[in-house]
Regions:
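Short, well-ordered loop/turn sites that connect or cap secondary structure elements
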Residues: 82-83, 142, 226
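NAD(P)H dinucleotide-binding glycine-rich loop of Rossmann-like/cofactor-binding domains
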Residues: 90-152
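Conserved beta-strand elements of the Class I
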Residues: 4, 31-32, 149
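Local beta-strand N-terminus motif with an aromatic residue
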Residues: 85, 101, 145, 189, ...
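Mid-domain Rossmann-like dinucleotide-binding core that forms the NAD(H)/NADP(H) cofactor-binding site
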Residues: 124-194
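Glycine-rich beta-strand-centered segment in the early N-terminal region that forms part
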Residues: 22-39, 52-95
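Cytochrome P450 core scaffold surrounding the K-helix E-X-X-R motif
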Residues: 43-49
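Glycine-rich cofactor phosphate-binding loops and adjacent beta1-alpha1 units
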Residues: 173, 187, 191-226
Length: 226
């Protein structure tokens, strides 16, 4: 089968190749997914550049990307919660990374059935970003009536964090650019801050949680608005 592989660390244009590789071998608790859509995330860029070698040592060549949606075409002997033909999506574990391929083997505990009202492409865009948003807010102890500042509300993680925070009953501030103000409001944010024309530090004074995926000065400035 064909798969996109990271063949060396460095600039993206020099580091990737579509290669012919063996179809994955299933373990007892795995399912084999025929890939219909896959997604890339910022972490994939940093892996390619070699910035994460100390934290994520990966033998090369290696498959790339974690998000996938598709159809189950085979399953292991110990898989009882899925059937051949199920439409599914997943954020695959580190050791099974490599979703930009014709097929990917995934442990069944990391797989969910795809909602019928979204496309394969939409489903593939959700898992890693969605889990990042959900797990971060849960770790922060989000609860109803919390005031939450979510930076970069129009990003993949931020847009999902807004929706999850609202579902938990929080009041949501978010920052975004002028072009995305209307869309972010439609996601449910209570106060949208256009960072090109407004300074969020003059608006947010009493946040219970600051959700920051940007880093740099935003991390240190968070203490000014809590």
């Amino acid at each position: 089968m064909k798969a996109l592989q990271l063949v060396k660390y460095g600039e993206i244009k020099d580091s990737l190749a579509f290669n012919e590789v063996s179809k994955p071998t299933l373990q007892a608790k795995d399912v084999l997914i025929e890939v219909k859509a896959a997604a890339i995330n910022p972490i994939d860029k940093y892996i390619i550049l070699g910035n994460l070698q100390g934290m994520l040592p990966i033998p090369l060549p290696s498959g790339l990307a974690y998000d996938v949606s598709g159809i189950i075409v085979e399953k292991g002997d110990e898989v009882s919660n899925f059937e051949i033909g199920d439409l599914v999506y997943s954020r695959v574990p580190q050791e099974q990374m490599g979703t930009i391929a014709e097929y990917v083997a995934v442990t069944s505990v990391a797989v969910s059935k795809k909602p019928g009202n979204i496309s394969f492409e939409e489903a593939a865009s959700i898992p890693l970003a969605g889990l990042t948003a959900l797990q971060s807010l849960e770790y922060a102890g989000i609860k109803a009536y919390d005031k939450v500042l979510i930076h970069a509300g129009s990003g993949g993680v931020g847009s999902l964090a807004i929706q999850y925070a609202k579902a938990r009953g929080a009041y949501v501030y978010t920052t975004t650019s002028t072009n995305n103000v209307k869309w972010v409001k439609e996601l449910g944010a209570d106060r949208v801050i256009d960072y090109k024309t407004e300074d969020y530090k003059t608006i947010v004074k009493d946040a219970d949680i600051v959700f920051d995926t940007l880093g740099g000065n935003y991390s240190s400035e968070a203490f000014q608005v809590i």
